[in-house]
Amino acid sequence: MADGIEKLPRGIRNKNPGNIKLGTAWDGLASEQSDPVFCVFGEAVMGIRALMKILLTYRFTHKKITVDDIISRWAPPSENDTNAYIDFVCKEINVNPMDKLDNSIEHYLPLVKSIIRMENGKQPYDDELLVEGMYRAWEGYPTGSSAS
């Protein structure tokens, strides 16, 4: 590995900032899957896209629209301290656990940033890259506060 790469958090190293587990044939996966548990993407923007696709599935398929609902599914108690994760995200984005999130960049960008920070201990991506990945995920989905 290149100098310093092995010291990066696993999710950043894998260009998978949401630490998405293997199992789905995501667009943008690297040809070599060097991690036995988590997906490795060729570009971080595609890992961000996958993270957002999951959040959109939570919203439109499972009707998860509060931080409590979203994080309880994202970080289940069988694998995480879900309540601590919810508290962290709520503090980061300044909402209450049961506040409903609008289906907009304004609401989901802070959520995505906080998930990345929680998963990796830091959030190294600029807003431009995050928004690009998020918009790639939103293709085909409605946007706006009325989309639920």
Identify the function of each model-found stretch.
Residues M1-S148:
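Cell-wall polysaccharide-cleaving catalytic domain and substrate-binding groove, primarily
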